[in-house]
Structure formats: structure tokens, C-alpha cells
Amino acid sequence: MTKFCDEFGGEILDGVTSDQILDFLNRITEGTKQQTRHVRYGHLSAFFNFITANIDADFHNPCSTPILRKMFKAKPIPSWEIIEKDVIDEIIFRTDKPRDRLILELMARGGMRIGEVLKLTPADVQDRKLTLKNPKSGKRREHVFIPQKVADRLKAYIRDNNIQPNQRIFPICYETARTMVKKAGEKVGIRLRPHDLRRHAATYASRSGVPIEIVSKVILRHANLSTTQIYLGKVPDTEAMRWIENLYA
């Protein structure tokens, strides 16, 4: 609202037109994601609605036009197909190459992004706790927690390959890793992408009873729960019935 006040502070609000609002919103949201555009529009529209509801019932909200609502509407939430645990397990167990299996496990068991996996060095590994330097969130560092069996395999891989503390554990490019994941999925007849494995880590934890706050803040390391809820996808009827039955059995 500061930018709005700077631009329109000297004007009578009744005189602000929809065209002016459109121009203003386009300028302050240039280069941003659609969700950001929607939020900025929502804040401004709520401000004008407040005036109508509390100050002047005859005031017309300049944001309330079909073209503005269409241009700044929220992006539809994607519906992800959730891959079941037995399928993920089969993919991992059928991957013979130690390097490739570890990459798959770190994503599927630790909820890591492919880019985070490829940046790992031995210096980042403290048994079951992995340190991510300069993560996507913009924080100085974040931490990932992995199962003991995966941690043991990771340490053995580092030792057996004589990887030095500041060398990358997996010195391959993103495209090579993406292709490996795709081929791993093809072995069991599914289309598999790196992020499907991270999404599986969250979904499996959630359906196993892990509190959503832990799924969000620890496994996925999201800033807010709304992003996590997109990851978790839809709960099928059979899953819903199983949980209700267990709850009241």
C-alpha cells in the first residue's frame, strides 16, 4: 500500500479509474509470478471494499471490473498424481548403481530437491543431518534429516570413492540426473520426475500421521503451510475412509 499512497496520495479516491489501477498494478508486479500479482490486486481491492463498507456506501471499487479480475486471478492449483510408497520402493530397489540409488533415496526419503542433492559435499554430511548452504529459501543454511540406513550408505559411498570434504559427492549436471530419474521410472512403467520424489516424501509422511507442521517446516522446509498443501495433493476416498475408520475404531 505504500506504493499506492505514494502515487495516489494526492488524489481524490472517487476519481481513481480502473485504467489507472490496471496501469499501476502492471508496473508494480512486472516480472513477478501470477500468485504475487493476485495478492497485490487482492490487497488493493480489499482496501477499496473497506471504504465502501465503512466510510462511503456509494463508493465504487475501481478494482471491481471483469478485466482486472481476469488479469489478476489466482493461478489454478495444479493437481499432482501421488506415487505410492511401494512403487517408489520398487524404483529404488531396482536401481543397481550406488550413486543413482543414493540420489533417488535422498529425494524420496529426505525430501530434497535435485539441485540440493547435486550440491552436497562430504563437509555437509553429519551422520543423519545434512547441511544445505545458500538454499533456495534465501536463508544462510538449512538442514535435512535422513534415515540412518541412507546415512550409512552415503558415508560408505563417500569413503569408497575417496571424495574430499569440499568436493561434490555427485559431480553430474541436472540434465544427467533428470534423465536418470526418468529412466528409473520407466523401469516400472511410470513417468517419473525429480520433484515427484520430493513430493512423495511429504505425502508419505503426512499419510503416516506426521503433523503437517513437521512435514512443512522440517521435510519440505517451506515458509508457509499453503505451499505444503499444494504438494500433498488430493486424498483418495479409500485413504480418507481408512483414516476415519482407524480414528473411530
Could you say what each language-model-derived stretch is?
Residues 1-77, 161, 187:
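N-terminal core-binding DNA-recognition domain of tyrosine recombinases/integrases
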Residues 72-89, 137-148, 163-168:
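DNA breakage-rejoining catalytic core of tyrosine-based enzymes
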Residues 85-114:
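Basic, Lys/Arg- and aromatic-enriched nucleic-acid-binding interface segment
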Residues 110, 115, 119-156:
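Conserved tyrosine-mediated DNA breakage-rejoining catalytic core shared by Y-recombinases
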Residues 136, 219-245:
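Catalytic-site neighborhood detector that most strongly recognizes the C-terminal catalytic loop/helix
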Residues 163-167, 178-218:
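Short, basic (Lys/Arg/His-rich) helix/loop patches that form interaction surfaces
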